[in-house]
């Protein structure tokens, strides 16, 4: 048994040698003792080693099919966009992590090709074009969760050129660093999603002598970080000044996904695609409104919309999303893993109450979202308004077993049906 000096009653840790008076706790084993400080040190060592093992597992890159399947579990519709994103993201992280991302002997095979040794693969940032509420942001968030990389969302409308009132573009990078818990190395392999990118389009198609600090000026400021540069970021955000320290982050391996609704872009696409005749006698090929979709977009359309050529050139992957149909919006409510209806059913079950939505109610919720023109984004606020009175009352009652929502309830023409708990128990007993 571990002792100190002449004192038979003074015990010490068998690992660090500290006496029981020098530590808070001494735990006894068969002939040995360990103090609380050594236990804490052991836990840190174990966590560090497990963390390194987890990081090693994360280097195995999922295939485009696996990425697509993951998106399918959470996002309804937009199959073309999901396939395009899966391939683009796979190629990006394959470029970042190298051949070891796929395992096997690929690294050895690559070194055998002398003609490819000095080839540098360029970065492929992504531009997503589509109406509001169609799932652009959610697609990017789901991608980042699957790849387990830091993810930051920025709003392009708040950005201005350096020296003007508003946010510098470097503040976008600060959000990514914060999402990585200030681990710059981890942040350098993250994803930045910039929304409302169409709001920084050039105010005029022709260059102007007047300064456009929130439009073309922001596009110019974004060019370097999109392409890849070592940026200096103020750790607390805000404007730069010479007497502060900066965080240095290399954006060469940061994947940028920029997105916007691009209202009016369909008219630009239509004017290009719908008039193919040349000369006075040539027939004009008129297209109807339904014949033009975002999927027909080309770089020259974005140029005419107001994006500068250099900015478009740094976004080589262009993918489009379309308005969700009525049936797809109903599926958004019920089918994904984190479906809105499932979320509310879980919340109600925490109070011991089942929640049921009739098919007519789901259709009514979607009809209201379509009337507002907000797409899937408006579904939660409609559900919240419908269920708010019930959610206020239920925690105070213990006699309710099930709440049934009909279409009339959603339309404000009736009250929810409350089935007593006893009736619900008997009903479940018969079905069992």
Swiss-Prot record:
Residues 1-54 form the ClpX-type ZB domain. Gene3D superfamilies: 1.10.8.60, ClpX chaperone, C4-type zinc finger domain, P-loop containing nucleotide triphosphate hydrolases. GO terms for cellular component: HslUV protease complex. Pfam families: AAA_2, ClpB_D2-small, zf-C4_ClpX. InterPro entries: AAA+_ATPase, ATP-dep_Clp_protease_ClpX, ATPase_AAA_core, Clp_ATPase_C, Clp_protease_ATP-bd_su_ClpX, ClpX_bact, P-loop_NTPase, Znf_CppX_C4. The keyword Mitochondrion does not apply. Coiled coil: none annotated. Keywords: ATP-binding, Chaperone, Metal-binding, Nucleotide-binding, Zinc. Zn(2+) binds at residues 13, 16, 35, 38. GO terms for biological process: cell division; proteolysis involved in protein catabolic process. ATP binds at residues 131-138. One of its GO terms (molecular function) is ATP-dependent protein folding chaperone. ATP-dependent specificity component of the Clp protease. It directs the protease to specific substrates. Can perform chaperone functions in the absence of ClpP. Component of the ClpX-ClpP complex. Forms a hexameric ring that, in the presence of ATP, binds to fourteen ClpP subunits assembled into a disk-like structure with a central cavity, resembling the structure of eukaryotic proteasomes. Belongs to the ClpX chaperone family. This is ATP-dependent Clp protease ATP-binding subunit ClpX. The lineage of its organism: Bacteria, Bacillati, Actinomycetota, Actinomycetes, Micrococcales. The gene is clpX.
């Amino acid at each position: 048994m571990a002792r100190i000096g002449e004192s038979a009653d003074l015990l010490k840790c068998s690992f660090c040698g500290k006496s029981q008076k020098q530590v808070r706790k001494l735990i006894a084993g068969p002939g040995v003792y360990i103090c609380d400080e050594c236990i804490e040190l052991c836990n840190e060592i174990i966590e560090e080693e497990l963390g390194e093992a987890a990081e090693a597992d994360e280097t195995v890159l999922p295939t485009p099919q696996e990425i697509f399947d993951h998106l399918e579990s959470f996002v309804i519709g937009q199959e073309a966009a999901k396939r395009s994103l899966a391939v683009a993201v796979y190629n990006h992280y394959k470029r970042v992590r190298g051949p070891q991302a796929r395992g096997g002997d690929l690294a050895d095979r690559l070194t055998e090709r002398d003609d490819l040794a000095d080839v540098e693969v360029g970065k492929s940032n992504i531009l997503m074009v589509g109406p509001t509420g169609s799932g652009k942001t959610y697609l990017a968030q789901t991608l980042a969760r699957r790849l387990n990389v830091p993810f930051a969302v920025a709003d392009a409308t708040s950005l201005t050129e350096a020296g003007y009132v508003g946010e510098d573009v470097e503040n976008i990078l600060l959000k990514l660093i914060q999402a990585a818990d200030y681990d710059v190395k981890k942040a350098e392999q993250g994803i930045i999603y910039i929304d409302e990118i169409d709001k920084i389009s050039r105010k005029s198609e022709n260059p102007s002598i007047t300064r456009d600090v929130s439009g073309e000026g922001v596009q110019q400021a974004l060019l370097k970080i999109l392409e890849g540069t070592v940026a200096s970021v103020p750790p607390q955000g805000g404007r730069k000044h010479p007497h502060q320290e900066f965080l240095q982050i290399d954006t060469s391996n940061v994947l940028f996904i920029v997105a916007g609704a691009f209202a009016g872009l369909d008219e630009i696409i239509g004017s290009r695609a719908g008039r193919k005749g040349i000369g006075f006698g040539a027939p004009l090929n008129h297209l109807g409104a339904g014949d033009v979709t975002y999927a027909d977009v080309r770089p020259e359309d974005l140029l005419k919309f107001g994006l500068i050529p250099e900015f478009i050139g740094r976004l080589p992957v262009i993918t489009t999303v379309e308005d969700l149909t009525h049936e797809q919006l109903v599926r958004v409510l019920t089918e994904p893993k984190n479906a809105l209806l499932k979320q509310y059913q879980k919340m109600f079950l925490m109070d011991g109450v089942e929640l049921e939505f009739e098919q007519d109610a789901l259709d009514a919720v979607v009809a209201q979202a379509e009337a507002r023109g907000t797409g899937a984004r408006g579904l939660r606020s409609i559900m919240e308004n419908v269920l708010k009175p019930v959610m206020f009352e239920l925690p105070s009652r213990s006699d309710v077993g099930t709440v049934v929502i009909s279409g009339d309830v959603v339309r404000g023409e009736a009250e929810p049906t409350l089935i007593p708990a006893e009736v619900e128990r008997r009903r479940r007993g018969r079905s069992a």
